[in-house]
Swiss-Prot record:
In the N-terminal section; belongs to the methyltransferase superfamily. tRNA (mnm(5)s(2)U34)-methyltransferase family. Keywords: Cytoplasm, FAD, Flavoprotein, Methyltransferase, Multifunctional enzyme, Oxidoreductase, S-adenosyl-L-methionine, Transferase, tRNA processing. Catalyzes the last two steps in the biosynthesis of 5-methylaminomethyl-2-thiouridine (mnm(5)s(2)U) at the wobble position (U34) in tRNA. Catalyzes the FAD-dependent demodification of cmnm(5)s(2)U34 to nm(5)s(2)U34, followed by the transfer of a methyl group from S-adenosyl-L-methionine to nm(5)s(2)U34, to form mnm(5)s(2)U34. Residues 1-246 are annotated as: tRNA (mnm(5)s(2)U34)-methyltransferase. It comes from Vibrio cholerae serotype O1 (strain ATCC 39315 / El Tor Inaba N16961). Its cofactor is FAD. This is tRNA 5-methylaminomethyl-2-thiouridine biosynthesis bifunctional protein MnmC.
Length: 674
């Protein structure tokens, strides 16, 4: 599958009417006369919106568009949907999902300038500006209006992106906006592959409208399965075409060995856990109207690996754009957006001060220089000379580095506890503390899971295991090939010099700037696979300080790091060998072992055996703060049958059964642990 490495911004000019014009395609982005009126006529009216929304019994309505451009179509339909919801608060349709593809996204400054033309859309445009993503390939998800509206921006050529949109057999899209520059200006886009791809993603009865009346477009859409007709064009334009998918041919691009299932009619869910994975998932499901019950073995949230005072937030990138990099780049941008939205509702210690990774030895230098060859946007990551690093960090290090200007740190404990307490106050979550779940049993007659805690039994429609390193306490997830690594973080008092550190510093360890709340830094963290208890480790405490001294031997200020107070915190990370989380339906180990024992010889794999209505969100490792929000969004989308925020090939890389499948494909037998 083709992997895009970088995205170019649109090159714009502005004509006498103040309309943006593409230098690449020599065409206007919208009508010189009244672009907003044209959008409403061509795309809303001809797709029968908002009338269709009144009788729609779905929870979420999905629109897909072939060219985002200035976002005019999106802003117009967002405005219409808000008006619909305000006028019809009891309607079954609750959410709007807008998927758009764009090869040359506008820069943020050009987007803001273009939006000056429509003051009536200003309140929506400003929200879009706030979270408009960097130009990173593939899907960038933006959640707006507390989940009322979701925007998926697929950056890249539509011919490469469209096949990556994960699609179940019944289809995904309710209405297509076939937009973009005129076929005469951009003939490469308007072709039969596009029309066929639109039909593959469409549901039965999906409508379609486009401003053009070109015969080859109409014939191509008809050949793809759409019933198209000419209708009166907007303003002085004589004709345009509109129609609907008359016959849906079942299609899926999801491999049977990596299939996933929604929980039909999902109303309530039990989450087993209590850390950042549980808190982000509970928040994301609550936005979708799902009632959440949390079962936590501890006396309050964030007592495990999510309980640290300060944790760094920055992406894990690779110059070759491997799967880890392709997951973490959008995950980090989504985390930034998600955390900023959380900060509008709850208080937690955090600072977007940037993260600086030092080239402290030859190995680190080679690794970081290789990463910079990935041609990432400079706002995401860029290199710094030794002198620039000194200025950025605030204390002398005299090492070159890479800097993540959008990174920073936050308090995982405060964020996790704040999110869960907010949901409790809102009546969206019921928490049961000191309630470890001992066993799960599927009840076929009721189609419910029975949970046992001691002598107490509870029943739930759906269950998510998000219990970190305790994943193996339940038989259904005990065989997942995950590891456990203890980490100790040291809390050190600041000094006059240490207080000048103004960026998270990463080397063979990490050190945060001082927290203004408590006057302490966090420095860490140890990696111990042998001892998984929560007891203080004096050797780890000493090594946390020594790592900094070892990496910066010429500097004197690291000697001010004082760990002698033995203030620290211990936690156990849940880690995967490939550095990616396990997100999705839980597979039945014993059945998979049997059904796939000759997978290497199978031409077409049979659908993988999954436990009904059982999911996992585990293996977040050391970068959980950067990945948890998007992984929670991905899992909630999967559970609810919504469009997915990552490409179908990346979903395979996150599937909880992936390592079993890989091994069986090689003709190797599964042992108890892969």
């Amino acid at each position: 599958m083709f992997i895009m490495s970088s995205i170019s911004h649109a090159q714009l000019g502005w004509n006498d009417a103040g309309t943006p014009v593409s230098d690449q395609f020599d065409d206007v982005y919208f009508s010189n006369v009244n672009g907003l009126a044209e959008t409403r006529y061509v795309f809303l009216e001809q797709n029968h919106l908002p009338q269709r929304w009144h009788n729609d019994d779905q929870r979420r309505f999905v629109i897909a568009e072939t060219g985002f451009g200035t976002g005019l179509n999106f802003l117009a339909v967002w405005q219409a949907f808000v008006a619909f919801r305000e006028a019809n608060p009891d309607a079954k349709l609750k959410e709007l999902h807008f998927i758009s593809f764009e090869k040359y996204p506008l820069s943020k400054s050009d987007l803001i300038q273009a939006h000056q033309a429509w003051p009536e859309l200003a309140q929506f445009a400003q929200k879009l500006h706030k979270h408009y993503p960097l130009a990173i390939p593939e899907c960038q998800r933006i959640v707006l209006n507390d989940g009322l509206v979701t925007l998926d921006l697929w950056f890249g050529d539509i011919k490469d992106c469209l096949p990556k949109v994960a699609t179940q057999e019944q289809g995904l899209v309710d209405a297509w906006f076939l937009d973009g520059f005129a076929p005469s200006k951009n003939p490469e886009m308007w072709n039969q592959n596009l029309f066929a791809g639109m039909a593959k993603l469409a549901k039965h009865g999906c409508t379609c409208a486009t401003f053009t009346s070109a015969g080859f477009v109409r014939r191509g859409l008809i050949d793809a399965g759409f019933a198209m007709k000419k209708v009166k064009g907007f303003g002085t334009k004589r004709e345009m075409i509109a129609g609907s998918l008359s016959e849906k041919v079942p299609y899926t691009n999801i491999a049977p060995e990596f299939r996933f299932e929604a929980t039909h009619g999902l109303q309530e869910v039990a989450i087993i856990g209590g850390g950042i994975a549980s808190a982000t998932l509970a928040t994301t499901l609550a936005r979708r109207g799902v009632a959440v019950t949390l079962y936590c073995a501890d006396e309050k949230p964030a007592q495990g690996a999510s309980g640290n005072r300060q944790g760094a937030v920055y992406p894990l990138l690779s110059g070759d754009h491997n799967a880890v990099s392709r997951v973490f780049a959008p995950a980090f941008l989504f985390a930034r957006q998600w955390i900023e939205q959380a900060a509008e509702q709850i208080n937690f210690d955090h600072d977007w001060c940037g993260v600086t990774q030092l080239m402290w030895d030859e190995k680190a230098t080679d690794k970081l220089k290789s990463m910079l060859e990935g041609n990432f946007p400079t706002q995401l990551v860029h290199g710094l000379s030794a002198e620039q690093t000194n200025q950025q960090v605030g204390v002398p290090v005299d090492k070159a580095s890479v800097h993540y200007p959008l990174g920073g740190w936050l308090s995982p404990a405060e964020l996790t506890q704040g999110l869960i307490h907010l949901l409790e106050q809102q009546g969206k979550l019921t928490a049961h503390y000191q309630t470890p779940i001992d066993a799960l049993t599927w009840q076929p007659e009721t189609q419910l899971w029975q949970l046992r805690s001691g002598d107490t039994l509870m029943s739930h429609q759906c269950v998510v295991i998000a219990s970190g390193h305790q994943f193996d306490s339940l038989s259904q997830t005990a065989e997942l090939p995950l590891g456990k690594v203890k980490g100790q973080v040291s809390h050190i008092p600041t000094t006059e010099t240490l207080s000048k550190i103004n960026s998270v510093l990463c080397y063979d360890g990490y050190m945060t700037p001082v927290s203004q709340q408590n006057g302490y830094h966090c420095i860490g963290a140890s990696y111990d696979r042998q001892h998984l208890d929560a007891t203080f480790d004096p050797q780890a405490q000493h090594e946390n300080a020594q790592k900094l001294i070892h990496c910066l031997p010429e500097q004197t200020w690291p000697l001010e790091v004082d760990v002698s107070g033995n203030q620290s915190r211990q936690g156990v990370r849940c880690v995967s060998r490939d550095h990616l989380p396990f997100v999705g339906n839980v597979g039945e180990f014993s059945k998979i072992t049997e059904q796939y024992r000759d997978l290497a010889q199978q031409h077409q794999a049979e659908p993988i055996a999954l436990y009904p209505q059982l999911y996992a969100l585990v293996g977040l490792g050391s970068r959980g703060l950067s990945s948890a929000p998007l992984m929670a969004e991905l899992l909630a989308s999967q559970m609810c049958g919504d469009p997915m925020p990552l490409g179908v090939d990346l979903l395979e890389q996150l599937h909880p059964s992936r390592m079993w499948v890989r091994k069986l494909r090689k003709g190797k037998a599964l042992t108890q642990k892969v």
